[in-house]
Amino acid sequence: MLGQSIRRFTTSVVRRSHYEEGPGKNIPFSVENKWRLLAMMTLFFGSGFAAPFFIVRHQLLKK
C-alpha cells in the first residue's frame, strides 16, 4: 500500500515537471542569435587569454 502510493507520487511528480527539450534548451545562455553568441564567446575566451598578457605588461610598466 505504501509502496504503491510512493510510486504514484513519483510518477506524478515526473509528469508535472516537464521542461522544454531540444538543442540549446539545456544551457544557461541563448544560441538563437549566432552573432550575439559569437560576441559573448569571444569576450569570455578572449578575456581569459588576454589577462596574463595585461598582467605582465602592468608588472613591466610598474616602477
Curated annotation (Swiss-Prot):
GO terms for cellular component: mitochondrial inner membrane; respiratory chain complex IV. It comes from the Eukaryota. The modification N6-succinyllysine is found at residue 25. Liver, heart, muscle and brain, contain the same isoform of COX VIIc, but at different concentrations. It is a single-pass membrane protein. The modification N6-acetyllysine is found at residue 25. The keyword Transmembrane applies. InterPro entries: COX7C/Cox8, COX7C/Cox8_sf. Residues 61-63 are mitochondrial intermembrane. Component of the cytochrome c oxidase (complex IV, CIV), a multisubunit enzyme composed of 14 subunits. The complex is composed of a catalytic core of 3 subunits MT-CO1, MT-CO2 and MT-CO3, encoded in the mitochondrial DNA, and 11 supernumerary subunits COX4I1 (or COX4I2), COX5A, COX5B, COX6A2 (or COX6A1), COX6B1 (or COX6B2), COX6C, COX7A1 (or COX7A2), COX7B, COX7C, COX8B and NDUFA4, which are encoded in the nuclear genome. This is Cytochrome c oxidase subunit 7C, mitochondrial. It comes from Bos taurus. The gene is COX7C.
